Swiss-Prot record:
This is Cytosolic purine 5'-nucleotidase. One of its GO terms (molecular function) is metal ion binding. IMP binds at residues 122, 124, 299, 303, 312, 347-349, 385. The lineage of its organism: Eukaryota, Amoebozoa, Evosea, Eumycetozoa, Dictyostelia. Broad specificity cytosolic 5'-nucleotidase that catalyzes the dephosphorylation of 6-hydroxypurine nucleoside 5'-monophosphates. In addition, possesses a phosphotransferase activity by which it can transfer a phosphate from a donor nucleoside monophosphate to an acceptor nucleoside. Through these activities regulates the purine nucleoside/nucleotide pools within the cell. Mg(2+) binds at residues 122, 124, 444. It catalyses: a ribonucleoside 5'-phosphate + H2O = a ribonucleoside + phosphate; a 2'-deoxyribonucleoside + a ribonucleoside 5'-phosphate = a ribonucleoside + a 2'-deoxyribonucleoside 5'-phosphate. Residues 1-15 have a biased composition (Low complexity). Residues 1-37, 252-273 are annotated as: Disordered. Belongs to the 5'(3')-deoxyribonucleotidase family.
Amino acid sequence: MAENNNNNNNNNNNNVSTPPHQKPHLTTGLRTSSSGLLMDKRRQDEEKFSAEQVAMGKKSPTKLFSAYSLNDLSNPPTDEELNNYKDLPASSLPPIHKREKLRRVFVNRDIKLDRIEFFGFDMDYTLAVYNSPDFEELAYDMVLDKLIDIGYPKSIRKLKYDPNFPTRGLFLDRELGNLLKIDSFGNIIICVHGRTTLSKNRTAEFYPSMRVSSDEIARNRFYLLNTLFTLPEACLYADLVDHLERESGLRLTEEVADEQQQMNSPPLSSLGSESVRIDESNHQPEGDLSFSNLFQDVRTACDLVHNDGSLKTRVLDDLPRYIRKTPDMPVFFDRLRQNKNKVFLLTNSEFYYTNKVMSYMMNGYNPNYQSWRDYFDVIIVGADKPRFFSEGTTIREVDTETGNLRITNVKDRFEQGKVYHGGSLSLFQKLTGAKGSRVLYIGDHIFADIIKSKKTHGWRNLLVVPELQHELEVMNQQKDTTIHLMNLEFIRAEIYRGLDSESTTPPDIEVLHQHLKNTNDKLNFAYNKYFGSLFKNGSKSTFFSMQVQRYADLYTSDYLNLLNYPLFYHFCANSLPLPHESSSFSSFDTSN
């Protein structure tokens, strides 16, 4: 019944008292039932029946009304009411109250917030929301500069980041230079080379099975672009493929350098930023540049920009431009503190960057907190996730005045206000007692934040998917297109009605298939003109969608959407029916 609370939770009616002889009704003032007239008629019939039973001596007059309708239930209902409640048909139930989609937390697995003792947070792209496309444009331009420094033609400097091109969940084929969108079973949905979307026939020439096999993924032929930090990387790689093939006269080859050579050649990230160069042993002879080599150079340049501090320095120089600041953030953390929850920060960022970003976002809002550090019970920077969740690293204490590290002997507990660097999950659990389902960890990185913490240690999790806001907006705008697609799929099913093994002439559905394709293309184009929706392609779920369903207990566009729920809330997941079950209650949705 928790969903019957409206968006302001349980504080909305504080000024309205309910007389002791009146109990609030389940539906009164909370939702309007389209079947209200039917309920009134039903109650009249029930009261008439009860009166007849009394007149016949079959029922005690002390209780004329023994069958409760939906409008009669208290909020929450009593045991007597539930025992005497008469069910409505599923089709007659009024719509379940749901929060506005843009403010909702979506549920894959049940979580009771009042059983969560520890709330943990990542920083980058979770607490620190980077303003798009400004941040991606900055990263894109800085990686371009690195590539020019190591010998790429200066003509690439004219390339610009296109926020309408990249999406997460793509597979980059190192051998052929293609970007692939695949479904949850590994089937190729879309193939893009440079900025050109390839036809199915052309795609099948490269991938005869039209699948990405697990063996090919295991041998690292495909690189999964799964984080928000990889958006500029995906765009730049595609732009370089186009530019180098069409304009610079360089010949990109499909040949892959010898694996032993690749193992023996030092990565660019091992070199100082002032002496970055291309190791010629790692490139094709006769001046050819392979797609694999191009990927390695782009990947390494991206790592350099992130690891040498240059990108972070630019962000810190103009925090309002690159990072969101909202007063809701300290409000949310104050509510966690008031609720006696333990709160920890677990980030891979170093202290100097974490301190300046968190100070910018949280300091100065609440006089009860002198520093952003006061909102947290434990602060760990330089965590080196996902390694933190396995063997970990040596834990050190950070001198918050100088930023220097010192070896510390943490025996009994982490001290509030202090900042620690590195460590491991085993040590964290030993010192805090935070284990398993009592921990809710909130992050944006499916692998480093979600999969490792969940599969290895049973932490509950909330995945932040900022793209969800755009997806929901497009879904709302394209309702008519979606309904038309559903109609076409229904028509296709009807064409085969009654056909069995005696039927020998297949129906001609070429025209219908073309309409289905055109409608599906229109819908995909509304999300992203190259790759479509992050979660769907028509009725097919994407690989990214599969990961979200499999590993994320909860997911939302912004962690601050938790402000729309009381901290005792019970998130209930939909019961997902098998195909043979779905027809029974196809219109009955009990999601949050």
